[in-house]
Amino acid sequence: MVKHKAARICINLECIDCKSNLHKRSNGISRYTTIKNRKNNPSRMELKKFCPYCNMRTIHKEIK
């Protein structure tokens, strides 16, 4: 029997510096897709990931 899989959901992470950074390498907004466990992380996630548009590691926040 399969147990409930509702605890793990797919989320999108978006770079917060891409909107305000004027000196970017190229135009666009970096987005990553990942999975989070809703029971362990009930609040919105923030991860430091590489942004190819800013050409550096920036904070990526969870979007709806």
Curated annotation (Swiss-Prot):
Does Chloroplast show up as a keyword for this record? Answer: yes
GO BP field: translation
Q: Name one GO cellular component term.
A: ribonucleoprotein complex
The record's annotation in InterPro entries points to: Ribosomal_bL33, Ribosomal_bL33_CS, Ribosomal_bL33_sf, Ribosomal_zn-bd
User: Which stretch is the leader sequence?
Assistant: none
Q: Name one GO molecular function term.
A: structural constituent of ribosome
The main location class comes to plastid
Family that this chain belongs to: Belongs to the bacterial ribosomal protein bL33 family.
Full protein name: Large ribosomal subunit protein bL33c
